[in-house]
């Protein structure tokens, strides 16, 4: 046996990224007009909203949550409303500060989102409706839109820095 201690990942100064867990954090389904809505023959309208949130849980440990809301209406009556939060816990160490926000806003949601899509489609199908398969999302484009909107808002307020979704500050 060797007397050398094994180093934990990320302790050697090298960048380290690990998925600890992906889990369904919250899920709700509302069908306020059932069972009568099943008798409607008109095609439903579908509205989808997706958002991303990130928070630090401990040193080098982050939770990234992808929030999805699907609202389907038939003749202005809500057929169903699904709200879901799919989260992942990520171990991220020795990553330069300027790369953390894109990692939390692009890479992590890209990993978590397929689980959210699956859970939403499954829930809608189990509720008696045709499953809705959410489209793929380009989280880089979404991140860049949020960054541009935040920069514009900051500029209008006369500020000099940018506060990102995780609470950190970035400058332009």
From Swiss-Prot:
It is found in: Cytoplasm. InterPro entries: SecB, SecB-like_sf. One of the proteins required for the normal export of preproteins out of the cell cytoplasm. It is a molecular chaperone that binds to a subset of precursor proteins, maintaining them in a translocation-competent state. It also specifically binds to its receptor SecA. One of its GO terms (cellular component) is cytoplasm. Keywords: Chaperone, Cytoplasm, Protein transport, Translocation, Transport. This is Protein-export protein SecB. Homotetramer, a dimer of dimers. One homotetramer interacts with 1 SecA dimer. The gene is secB. GO terms for molecular function: unfolded protein binding. It comes from Ralstonia pickettii (strain 12J). Belongs to the SecB family. Gene3D superfamilies: SecB-like (3.10.420.10).
């Amino acid at each position: 046996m060797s007397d050398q201690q094994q180093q934990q990942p990320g302790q050697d100064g090298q960048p380290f990224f690990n998925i600890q867990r992906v889990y369904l954090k919250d899920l709700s389904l509302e069908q306020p007009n059932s069972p009568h809505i099943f008798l409607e023959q008109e095609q439903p309208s579908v509205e989808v909203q997706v958002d991303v949130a990130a928070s630090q849980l401990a040193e080098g440990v982050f939770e990234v949550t992808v929030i999805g809301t699907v609202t389907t209406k038939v003749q202005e009556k809500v057929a169903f409303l699904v709200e879901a939060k799919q989260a992942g816990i990520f171990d991220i160490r020795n990553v330069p500060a300027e790369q953390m926000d894109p990692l939390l806003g692009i890479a992590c949601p890209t990993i978590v989102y397929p689980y959210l899509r699956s859970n939403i489609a499954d829930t809608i199908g189990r509720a008696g409706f045709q499953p809705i398969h959410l489209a793929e999302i380009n989280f880089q484009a979404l991140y860049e839109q949020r960054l541009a909107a935040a920069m514009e808002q900051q500029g209008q307020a006369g500020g000099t820095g940018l506060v990102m979704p995780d609470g950190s500050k970035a400058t332009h």
